[in-house]
Amino acid sequence: MRITQGTFSYLPDFTDEEITAQINYALTNDWPLSVEFTDDPHPRNTYWEMWGLPMFDLRDPAGVLMEVNACRAANPNAYVRLNAYDASLGRQTTALSFIVQRPAEEPGFRLDRAEGRGRAIGYTTHSYATERPVGDRYTQG
């Protein structure tokens, strides 16, 4: 099951050239970028691990792509995403966010139903990947 989070999630994975074009677009709009990674892509897990610090002063698309590739190399079985931030409204908001790397296999989610008070049904999603230990969720074995 392909995780669909962020901009471009329904498109095929981007090449480095296409990622560079998006980086250039963000930098042209004065949006600083950051790289994040996780092995728990649950839709409510909005706080992924940061790769280094946000690149507020980096103006070169090649430098940002170098950080993306360093994160990919260090976390080959994780989801990696690139975020661009817009502070033009007086607060830091996400202007662009998209996944630049996925594990080879994405096991998907299970929907759990539970009956509550007054026979109200509550729903919870559970990632099959989280049944394995952190750091071992997308490796073969």
From Swiss-Prot:
Gene3D superfamilies: Ribulose bisphosphate carboxylase, small subunit
InterPro entries assigned: RuBisCO_ssu, RuBisCO_ssu_dom, RuBisCO_ssu_sf
Molecular function via GO: ribulose-bisphosphate carboxylase activity
GO BP, one annotated term: reductive pentose-phosphate cycle
Pfam families: RuBisCO_small
Source organism superkingdom: Bacteria
Record's keyword terms, sorted: Calvin cycle, Carbon dioxide fixation
CDD domains from the UniProt entry: RuBisCO_small
Induction context: Transcription is 18-fold up-regulated by growth on H(2)/bicarbonate compared to pyruvate, RuBisCO activity is induced by growth on H(2), H(2)/bicarbonate, formate, methanol and CO.
Function according to Swiss-Prot or TrEMBL: RuBisCO catalyzes two reactions: the carboxylation of D-ribulose 1,5-bisphosphate, the primary event in carbon dioxide fixation, as well as the oxidative fragmentation of the pentose substrate. Both reactions occur simultaneously and in competition at the same active site. Although the small subunit is not catalytic it is essential for maximal activity.
Additional remarks: The basic functional RuBisCO is composed of a large chain homodimer in a 'head-to-tail' conformation. In form I RuBisCO this homodimer is arranged in a barrel-like tetramer with the small subunits forming a tetrameric 'cap' on each end of the 'barrel'.
Family: Belongs to the RuBisCO small chain family.
Subunit note: Heterohexadecamer of 8 large and 8 small subunits.
Protein name from the UniProt record: Ribulose bisphosphate carboxylase small subunit
